[in-house]
Curated annotation (Swiss-Prot):
Name of the protein described by the UniProt record: Ribulose bisphosphate carboxylase/oxygenase activase, chloroplastic
GO molecular function term, any single one: ATP binding
Chief location of this protein within or outside the cell: plastid
Organism: Pinus pinaster
Keywords, sorted A to Z: ATP-binding, Chloroplast, Nucleotide-binding, Plastid, Stress response
Induction (free text): By water stress.
Length: 10
């Protein structure tokens, strides 16, 4: 995916 997914990790 991208950066946001790594940070939020829903």
């Amino acid at each position: 995916s991208f950066q946001c997914e790594l940070v939020f990790a829903k």
